[in-house]
Amino acid sequence: MSDAEVAALLDRLVAQFEGPYDFLRELVQNSLDAGSDRAEVALEVHPGEGEDPDAAVFELRVADAGCGMDEAILDGGLTRLFASSKADDRTMAGGFGIGFVSVFAWQPDAVVVHTGRAGEAWELTFFADRRFEKRALAEPWEGTTVTLLRRGRAQERAQIAEAVRDSLWRWCRFCRLELSFEDVAGGEGPELIQDAPAPPGALAVVDERGDGSVHVAFAVPPEAVMLRRGLVLAQGPAVDLLADLTPP
């Protein structure tokens, strides 16, 4: 494929995600799939270049303590956007490689990945045009940390922080790890992003089959929530999400 064809395909992959902050769900999925017991999301603001006092660089970081990646995984999965080691593993929630492309929906100026596994440690820097550079690190690294950097205006911080918080609560509130978000400049410390589905009531029906289950209960208005490993895949009116099951 030519560079232009690859760029067009990458743009289509980015466009498949509903919103610019959906990448947070994809990165939390990767943390789950890496076996991490926690994922820490943080937003920091740094002064921008030049003399403009309102210029800023936003640093949005997702760090986990999972199994990390070695060079073989990086070359065979993360940097080959069409390769996914998860394709045949139904216990995996994400689409490694393809899912990682979602970070570009936030339109970062750069994305930096630090990761380590089996004595290896690596740093990858992805640029806005999807080029990347890879270098080995001398010091060991635990898990994987993905850092997005984007230029903007300092007054955007509160809006970005709220969008991050909303996305995490929307998609990841039931996830099976300890998830936190810290707006560093806000000064309130880390916020735990955690909730639990309501327990089955007297009029609820639970159907468990294999590693999946269906919970049916009364709700006003009727709503459907689709989860996989605690991550919200879709949520909305039952008539839309379960069209094949609802009467005409």
Regions found by a protein language model. Name each.
Residues 41-43, 118-128, 202-206, 212-219:
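Broad, structure-driven detector of short, well-ordered beta-strand segments within folded domains
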Residues 173-248:
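GHKL/Histidine-kinase-like ATPase module
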Residues 64:
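Acidic ATP/Mg2+-coordinating residue in the GHKL
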Residues 88-191:
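GHKL-type ATPase core
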Residues 67-68:
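Glycine-rich G1-box
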Residues 55-60, 144:
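Short beta-strand element(s) in the Bergerat
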Residues 1-40, 44-55, 71-79:
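Bergerat-fold GHKL ATPase/HATPase_c domain
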